[in-house]
């Protein structure tokens, strides 16, 4: 009953207004005393491990978002160096992992979503990934919220897709149809030695914004699907383990690979917690 009420509340809440307001407050430097109280409460409530942060003193962060997107101290995470290993791009918990069924990506029992819609509604963009592999990783409030490359790659396209801002958790995954292809998201497409790779950064309720290292905060005001091409001198090269983006509060990363490009590690299963840099799959490098 409580789950149903929670899901119903997601439909009636003014998601965009609430999330944008939360984002502005999280970026505010006007009330440092209040900011410090909120951060202290947040650390206690969610069990944030500040000992692994580059700046362990929570009062040193000028805003809540600066705290939320905090860097890790050197050596806090180890990136598996094996060239044939695809590594976890984030700290989080695996929501689902497996094979794409034509154009359908498994979401939860009785629920799936469209690969084509996830990537912005373009059939040509989605085609290389049909029957491919996917992993959906949820970042909880306590997690490190920067996103890193699971393998080396060259950015070729970024797509902003406007949408809803449902909360992203097991309850909504089981009860909100097409959740990850319904929420606001940023799809980043790369060329790699194993073929094309897509990393989709999915927004959620209270997520202030999604940010990439090459474009900053991605939030067009057009309300339309917006895409950017990166060719020639504009191409952006990334090394394995290099930061590529971050969430300013919350959410989920969907990693998509072509058929046969990767074999997931046997221990990487739904509900397992993962850390940035650990072995996630074995690549079939071309």
Curated annotation (Swiss-Prot):
Task: Say if the entry is tagged with keyword Nucleus.
Answer: no
Name it: Phosphatidylserine decarboxylase proenzyme
Record key words, sorted: Cell membrane, Decarboxylase, Lipid biosynthesis, Lipid metabolism, Lyase, Membrane, Phospholipid biosynthesis, Phospholipid metabolism, Pyruvate, Zymogen
The membrane topology of this protein is:
Peripheral membrane protein
Provide the assembly information. Heterodimer of a large membrane-associated beta subunit and a small pyruvoyl-containing alpha subunit.
Q: Which reaction does it catalyse?
A: a 1,2-diacyl-sn-glycero-3-phospho-L-serine + H(+) = a 1,2-diacyl-sn-glycero-3-phosphoethanolamine + CO2
Q: Does the keyword Secreted apply?
A: no
Q: What is its main location?
A: membrane
- GO cellular component terms? plasma membrane
Q: Which GO terms describe its biological process?
A: phosphatidylethanolamine biosynthetic process
| Pfam families linked to this entry | PS_Dcarbxylase
Provide the protein's localization. Answer: Cell membrane
At what residues does the UniProt record annotate the site feature described as Cleavage (non-hydrolytic)? Answer: 250-251
One annotated GO molecular function is: phosphatidylserine decarboxylase activity
What post-translational events are described? Answer: Is synthesized initially as an inactive proenzyme. Formation of the active enzyme involves a self-maturation process in which the active site pyruvoyl group is generated from an internal serine residue via an autocatalytic post-translational modification. Two non-identical subunits are generated from the proenzyme in this reaction, and the pyruvate is formed at the N-terminus of the alpha chain, which is derived from the carboxyl end of the proenzyme.
Q: What is its EC number?
A: 4.1.1.65
Question: What function does this protein fulfil?
Answer: Catalyzes the formation of phosphatidylethanolamine (PtdEtn) from phosphatidylserine (PtdSer).
**InterPro entries tied to this protein:** PS_Dcarbxylase, PSD-B, PSD_type1_pro
Q: Which NCBIfam families match?
A: PS_decarb
Q: Where do the catalytic residues lie?
A: 91 (charge relay system), 148 (charge relay system), 251 (charge relay system), 251 (schiff-base intermediate with substrate)
Q: Which top-level enzyme class is recorded in the Swiss-Prot or TrEMBL entry? A: lyase
Q: Bound how, and how many: what does the cofactor note say?
A: Binds 1 pyruvoyl group covalently per subunit.
- Give the family from UniProt: Belongs to the phosphatidylserine decarboxylase family. PSD-B subfamily. Prokaryotic type I sub-subfamily.
